[in-house]
From Swiss-Prot:
This is Succinylglutamate desuccinylase. The gene is astE. It catalyses: N-succinyl-L-glutamate + H2O = L-glutamate + succinate. Gene3D superfamilies: Zn peptidases. Transforms N(2)-succinylglutamate into succinate and glutamate. One of its GO terms (biological process) is arginine catabolic process to glutamate. Its EC number is 3.5.1.96. CDD domains: M14_ASTE.
């Protein structure tokens, strides 16, 4: 199985759907779904996903390289792994999504969207995770969902962690720092993301890794993500990574800006970077007679997007944690 990405993009099913790798067994579970199981018993299970948005190609290329290293035998596998390329049709078309944003659909939220390939795919991925986690006895469950951002950022690499009722494990947060993440953003409310689904339903330690800016296939400079690729390689092979000398800055979400109608106006231009700072009282958005302003001394914006569909998030406002 040395052509997983090509088969996924072409919509082709391989003639052989299971086999042996270097110290592991593999199974093709469907387009964009590949299960890897070490020959030796392990108690760790990992979801490695990318391509939930079809225009975010750098993480897909990173996963393709990791798979090549595993199948060539240059990288040892010490986890049960489910590799997920989330939205094959959008990846093949080079667009963010074909109908609706899949990363708002998980946890059954796909039922509130008009039926489409993306709603069906979200349901398929939910079932795939359920099958994967229920078929093993993993003591440790991780989910790393790799993305790139639409906009540039004051932090080139950062992580977004779902709302969680229990404390985050220190080794997981330390690994995120070792993977080169410059900032971690902690959600305070449930959401429809893939990582919130895996965390809420299966107790996985989950993080959305934002790695640079969205570019087409072949135009990514993967060298700027070497530290992340090296950390992923070390993780898969069971090698402990050194702790980052500069731990990631930490932020938490304090409010969400939502577009409800065509009257919505977001007062941020296309040059506004993620983590741009705004002072207390700054007018951020208006919609009819509703005004959205900064309520803390300073707040930072994440994912500003004035052109989202009505009812969806147009931005998150953050505060820095000590």
């Amino acid at each position: 199985m040395d052509n997983f990405l090509a088969l996924t993009l072409s919509g082709t099913t391989p003639r052989v759907t299971q086999g042996k790798g270097a110290g592991f067994r593999w199974r093709w579970l469907g387009h964009g779904l590949l299960e890897l199981t070490p020959d030796a018993p392990v108690d760790r299970a990992l979801i490695l996903s990318a391509g939930i948005h079809g225009n975010e190609t750098a993480p897909v290329e990173m996963l393709d390289r990791l798979l090549s290293a595993l199948f060539s035998g240059s990288l040892t596998l010490t986890w049960r792994v489910l590799v997920v390329l989330g939205n094959p049709q959008a990846l093949a078309a080079g667009i963010r999504y074909c109908h609706s944003d899949m990363n708002r659909m998980f946890g059954g939220r796909w039922q509130s969207f008009a039926e489409s390939d993306e709603t069906r795919r979200a349901r398929e991925l939910e079932l795939s995770l359920e099958t994967f986690f229920s078929s093993g006895q993993a003591r440790v469950r991780w989910h790393l969902d790799l993305h790139t951002a639409i906009r540039g950022s004051h932090h080139l690499r950062f992580g977004v962690l779902p709302q969680r009722d229990r404390p985050w494990e220190t080794d997981f947060l330390a690994w995120l720092g070792a993977a080169g993440l410059e900032a971690l953003v902690f959600h305070q409310a449930p959401g429809g993301t893939f990582t919130h689904f895996s965390s809420e339903h299966f107790g996985a330690l989950s993080c959305t890794l934002e790695l640079g800016k969205a570019l087409p296939f072949g135009q990514n400079d993967l060298t700027q993500f070497n530290v992340t690729s090296q950390a992923l390689s070390a993780l898969l092979s069971g090698v402990e990574t050194s702790t980052s000398s500069s731990p990631p800055l930490r932020y938490r979400v304090v409010s969400q800006i939502t577009r409800h109608s065509d009257k919505f106006a977001l007062y941020m231009d296309v040059q506004t970077l993620n983590f741009t700072v705004f002072a207390k009282g700054t007018l951020l958005a208006e919609e009819g007679d509703k005004r959205v302003t900064v309520t803390h001394d300073v707040e930072y914006v994440l994912f500003p997007n004035p052109s989202v569909a009505c009812g969806l998030r147009a931005g998150l406002m953050l505060e820095r944690l000590p």
